[in-house]
Amino acid sequence: MEKLSEKDKGLIRDSWESLGKNKVPHGIVLFTRLFELDPALLTLFSYSTNCGDAPECLSSPEFLEHVTKVMLVIDAAVSHLDDLHTLEDFLLNLGRKHQAVGVNTQSFALVGESLLYMLQSSLGPAYTTSLRQAWLTMYSIVVSAMTRGWAKNGEHKSN
């Protein structure tokens, strides 16, 4: 498992300090980018009749609730940088939930790319190569646990 250095943790915490206070607007940037990268992902949000296209989806209350939840997961990861393993059960379950609704693991990579895009567009010149790498490392730890949960859920369905 990858490890975060103390420097990485500091970079992540410092960059998240302002972003975490405005979760929904930054989450909308993340999801706007995600839907630009793969518009087909819109079909996964069938709980809302307002998800015919990205702008409709991004303004629906149900979807904004999902945006908030995603940003809270990022917030939890940042808050637990010293002990990310304590989120293991939560992340395994999150992976299972994503598998159950038809999300494939390749989409996790697109979310990571969209997260980096949001960070870059929000932080401007403060977005450095070191900061990017720190966030990539943290995200890979989170996604690794989610992927294990996703795979376990798939095993249970095939048995």
Swiss-Prot record:
Residue ranges of every copy of the Globin domain listed in the record: 3-151
SUPFAM superfamilies in UniProt: Globin-like
Tissue spec. comment: Detected in brain, eye and gill, but not in muscle and blood (at protein level). Particularly high expression in the periventral zone of tectum opticum, with significant expression detected in white matter, preglomerular nucleus, posterior tubular nucleus, torus longitudinalis, hypothalamus, pituitary gland, posterior tuberculum, hypothalamus, synencephalon and formatio reticularis. Detected also in brain regions of the visual system, predominantly in parts of tectum opticum and torus semicircularis, area dorsalis telencephali and medulla oblongata.
Effect of residue 9 to Q: Reduced membrane transducing activity. Loss of membrane transducing activity
Molecular function via GO: GDP-dissociation inhibitor activity; heme binding; metal ion binding; nitrite reductase activity; oxygen binding; oxygen carrier activity
PROSITE patterns, per database record: GLOBIN (PS01033)
Binding residues for heme b: 66, 98
Catalytic activity line of the entry: Fe(III)-heme b-[protein] + nitric oxide + H2O = Fe(II)-heme b-[protein] + nitrite + 2 H(+)
Principal subcellular localization: cytoplasm
Gene3D superfamilies in the cross-refs: Globins (1.10.490.10)
Outcome of substituting residue 23 to Q: Reduced membrane transducing activity. Loss of membrane transducing activity
UniProt-listed Enzyme Commission number(s): 1.7.-.-
Effect of residue 7 to A: Reduced membrane transducing activity. Loss of membrane transducing activity
Entry coiled-coil feature ranges: none
Pfam families in alphabetical order: Globin
GO biological process, alphabetically ordered: cellular response to hypoxia; oxygen transport; response to hypoxia
Induction info: Expression is significantly up-regulated by severe hypoxia in brain but not in eye.
This protein's UniProt keywords: Cytoplasm, Heme, Iron, Metal-binding, Mitochondrion, Oxidoreductase
Family: Belongs to the globin family.
Subunit structure: Monomer. Homodimers and homotetramers. Mainly monomeric but also detected as part of homodimers and homotetramers.
Role this protein plays: Monomeric globin with a bis-histidyl six-coordinate heme-iron atom through which it can bind dioxygen, carbon monoxide and nitric oxide. Could help transport oxygen and increase its availability to the metabolically active neuronal tissues, though its low quantity in tissues as well as its high affinity for dioxygen, which may limit its oxygen-releasing ability, argue against it. The ferrous/deoxygenated form exhibits a nitrite reductase activity and it could produce nitric oxide which in turn inhibits cellular respiration in response to hypoxia.
Name of this protein: Neuroglobin
The species this protein was found in: Danio rerio (Zebrafish)
